[in-house]
């Protein structure tokens, strides 16, 4: 079970509100292969600190804080 501290959860929700664009650096998922460099849009951050993201051309998949890597795209 993954989880983050309340402080980390608040920071993630502030930094990645719905609509934030992100670029995938690394996704640790043996079942879904989304290439590094793929761009997506954050839908929401859940209570475990996972960023639920709609990936351009790859459907939806959550990223796990502390496991997966991404960067925010400045607009």
Q: Whereabouts are the PLM-identified features?
A:
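Basic/aromatic-rich interaction segments and small domains that mediate binding to polyanionic partners
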Residues: 2-75
């Amino acid at each position: 079970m993954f989880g983050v501290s309340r402080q980390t959860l608040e920071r993630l929700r502030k930094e990645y509100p719905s609509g934030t664009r992100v670029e995938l650096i690394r996704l640790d998922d043996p079942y879904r292969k989304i290439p590094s460099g793929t761009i997506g849009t954050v839908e929401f951050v859940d209570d475990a600190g996972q960023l639920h993201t709609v990936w351009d051309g790859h459907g939806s998949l959550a990223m796990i804080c502390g496991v997966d890597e991404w960067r925010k795209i400045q607009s």
